[in-house]
Amino acid sequence: MVALRRAVALNAVAIARLQTRALTARTRSLALASSQYRAYKTSSRQHAFHSQLENTPTPSAFQYQKPPTVENPQTLVEKIAQQYAVGLAPGKKIKAGDYIALAPHHCMSHDNTWPIAKKFLDIGASKIHNNRQVVFTLDHDVQNKSEANLKKYSLIHEFAEKHGVIHYPAGRGIGHQIMVEEGYAWPGTVSVASDSHSNMYGGIGCLGTAVVRTDAASIWATGQTWWQVPPVAKVTFTGILPPGVTGKDVIIALCGLFRDDQVLNHAVEFAGGESLPIDDRLTISNMTTEWGALAGVFPVDEMLISWYRGKATTNAMFGGSSKDRINHKRVDELEQNRLEADPNAKYAKELYLNLSTLSPIVAGPNSVKIATPLKNLEAEDIPVNKAYLVSCTNSRASDIAAAARVFREAAKENKDVKIAPGVNFYIAAASLPEQEIAEEAGDWQVLRDAGAQVLPAGCGPCIGLGTGLLEPGEVGISASNRNFKGRMGSTSAKAYLASPEIVAASALKGKIAGPGWYQKPEGVEKVIIGEGSGDYVADKALSIEDALDKLINEADALIAAAETSEGAKEQAASPTAAEGEESLTEILPGFPEKVEGEIVFCDSDNINTDGIYPGKYTYQDNVSVEKMAEVCMENYDTEFGKFAKAGDILVTGFNFGCGSSREQAATALLAKKIPLVVSGSFGNIFSRNSINNALMGVEVPRLVERLRETYKNDTEKPLTRRTGWKLVWDVRRSKVIVTEKDGSSWEQKVGELPANVQEIIARGGLEKWVKAKIDA
């Protein structure tokens, strides 16, 4: 055994030496190696931070220095979550994968507040655990003046007054914008919302993530909910944005170029974006939701500190509703106690994007994963019927100013500048304070004079509510965040996403177009992206370090296998050893040992919550179970209801249930009497809603691939098909048995269903589980 250890050790050392020599040789010729990763060279003055200049010497230009080592290192996301985790064992450092009890700094809800309140009351709660933790903002259906909607708003107001909850009325602004501008979302804290775009808070260094309605009710009642710390991906920005390129172009590029679920169900930490304005960061973080991430967090840097200093000074001089939360004392504390990722923090993956190589980009139609350079779409002369400068993503004062600039510059050539004939241009500020800033600057009036139609500060057409929805066959271009089929109107309409200036230019010209501000930098031929940090030497050194770690682990495994081989042989020869013995999962009372049914197959990836349950029904609180079953999957396939039957097992592609936090995406499938959903992978927020509402789900990528292989030559390609295949999920044995149409069958091991999840589902969902705990 000593000889074996020595041989393995010598082998590892030899390989390490060879790879180290390769690194040394690469480092000595750095000037040649790194040049291919530069975006462009120029002799003109560069407006950039010192560290970003092309020829600035840095230590890494001469040799790679390994970052200092911290014991049990944590990412920024893990550090922030650590501060808001309750009940941890002494000395416990949380890491990705851990389940924790999370007590967020703030929990925001919007028009879904009343359904949450009903859940809160139904579980037997009578008092909000911490009324300073909770914020209500009415923002989604603010144009709806029906008696039913006004009554709901009145009930929310009365509930807030009774319990002393901070609340903002309809028309004040979009909840996520209020959370940021009023200082509820704060750097280094955790703020959640029962809305999927709470990721936006990451733009100011706050860990913002979505919860669902039942979670919110639990937070109201107990101050906390459960949360699994996600794997963390690090995204490094290199270079600086050229003029005419915005934060919206950055996030569209990330969604479209890294479109293979690289960050699905991850939290993202951004680095290297020191030059990005805060409004651009808010846009980028906001749409990390569409990228598939659970959070998108920027670091606290000088740009952010300066931004808060400005707001604190304004509050000190003129007062303001946020003065108790945004003031110099609090900014001082923030500056002195910045949370940062440990230098040797471990990330699930690392990606980079060279900002200098970006150009204006448009997403669509009807998908954020289709990203096309603006110049390509301009060449197609795509007519536009409706344009939208709305949403929490891009309707702040800076966005309105950018749109107004388009019309101001056009007015230099033609004083009477108007929106193109046949185009409707809708504008709604992210909040009243942002609208007031735009009004004082004259930008709001410029857009109105050009013919823009003003909507109240709120979500409106972004969520498919109110005035200006897309009609069948129409084309729309929006500065919002989501262009799923049917979300902004008709399922036969086409929706594109773009920056505010592109939206304004398109409204002006009557077709998808830009204002002409972008000038391609010399030498830029393509967008530079990749895995790693974008620093060739550092990435190469880290890859060698990973290789050494892998060798050591393999050596340990080889030694352990050799040391135990005799014992293993003896055990295998023992008559008591049961061949194929399998561990069995304990099944709790009330939970089925097996779930079985015929497979109905929806062969699409990224089926989103709008596809599962249309947004136009989301804020109708009295929709019957029968109606929910009728409209289930309507935006994905209008024929779904004809194919799917009670008791069927729905099998879908990858990333099923991405999109919003609406719980009806789960309850509509239950209304359709579908007991189990099988997919290649699930969006995290759908998984959370499923568990909370007692819908079972299991990931079986092999089944999806097998079905696709079987039907790959089918020329019809229906969105939904009955397969004649049968599936049995043996929960006790943690496996699925699939019987294909020809009678052949096969098995696949799946993850064990833990007891706590069984208990919630057996109780009929989290709401009933919490009620049982309270009653006990």
From Swiss-Prot:
**Reaction catalysed?**
(2R,3S)-homoisocitrate = cis-homoaconitate + H2O
- Protein name in the entry: Homoaconitase, mitochondrial
Q: Where is the transit peptide?
A: 1-24
Q: Where in the cell is it found?
A: Mitochondrion
Q: How is the cofactor bound?
A: Binds 1 [4Fe-4S] cluster per subunit.
Q: Which InterPro entries match?
A: Acnase/IPM_dHydase_lsu_aba_1/3 (IPR015931), Acoase/IPM_deHydtase_lsu_aba (IPR001030), Aconitase/3IPM_dehydase_swvl (IPR015928), Aconitase_4Fe-4S_BS (IPR018136), Aconitase_4Fe-4S_dom (IPR036008), AconitaseA/IPMdHydase_ssu_swvl (IPR000573), Homoaconitase_mito (IPR004418), Homoaconitase_swivel (IPR039386)
| Molecular-function annotations in GO | 4 iron, 4 sulfur cluster binding; homoaconitate hydratase activity; metal ion binding
Record EC number: 4.2.1.36
Family as reported in the entry's similarity comment: Belongs to the aconitase/IPM isomerase family.
Q: What class of enzyme is it?
A: lyase
Q: Where does [4Fe-4S] cluster bind?
A: 392, 459, 462
GO CC list: mitochondrion
| Database matches in CDD domains | Homoaconitase_Swivel
**Cofactor field:** [4Fe-4S] cluster
